């Protein structure tokens, strides 16, 4: 069931990104891309739509190595779920850290969950709180609301000292534009 939900999330997020592209107007020579948004026909996303997770992982990998934030995030999801690749939380953690460091809210939220559950890393409520807070700052709308709820739920299991430490680390992380978030 988790794999089916993850597949749906991957496909829907890809479709939403593709639909968010506005048509170019004016002189195309003066248009500066703000971010690399995949076109609906790009191979890794088409592979996901077909349910070819192994093929998608193979296509995402070189892009992720070159720094493509969405490829890093999607590869992290595939490794965390074991879809198309052997499940490997350490590798998922690696890709989510890279994407989170580039400001990807989804990857930041995945890091929070991995720290909260101890997946690929020692369970750490302080770091989970930090990444939930950072992801909340990077998100908008309903996803922001859900992330903040998760953070607040985590806070109920923490001491005041842990929360104070987490808030200090969150501030440091945000002020450094995700460069000093206590990650290795």
Give the residues covered by each predicted segment.
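Bacterial N-terminal signal peptides
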Residues: 7-16
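Short coil/turn and helix-start
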Residues: 49-50, 65-66, 70, 79-87, ...
């Amino acid at each position: 069931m988790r794999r089916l939900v993850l597949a749906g999330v991957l496909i829907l997020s890809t479709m939403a990104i593709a639909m968010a592209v506005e048509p170019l107007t004016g002189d195309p020579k003066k248009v500066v891309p703000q971010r690399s948004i995949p076109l609906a026909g790009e191979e890794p996303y088409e592979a996901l739509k077909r349910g070819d997770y192994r093929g998608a992982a193979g296509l995402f990998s070189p892009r992720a190595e070159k720094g493509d934030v969405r490829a890093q995030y999607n590869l992290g999801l595939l490794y965390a779920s074991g879809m198309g690749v052997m499940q490997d939380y350490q590798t998922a953690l690696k890709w989510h850290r890279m994407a989170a460091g580039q400001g990807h809210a989804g990857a930041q939220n995945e890091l929070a969950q991995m720290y909260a559950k101890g997946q690929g890393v020692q369970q750490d409520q302080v770091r989970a709180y930090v990444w939930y807070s950072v992801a909340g700052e990077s998100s908008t709308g309903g996803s922001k609301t859900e992330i903040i709820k998760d953070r607040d739920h985590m806070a109920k299991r923490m001491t005041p000292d842990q929360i104070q430490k987490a808030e200090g680390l969150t501030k440091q992380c945000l002020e450094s534009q995700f460069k000093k978030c206590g990650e290795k």
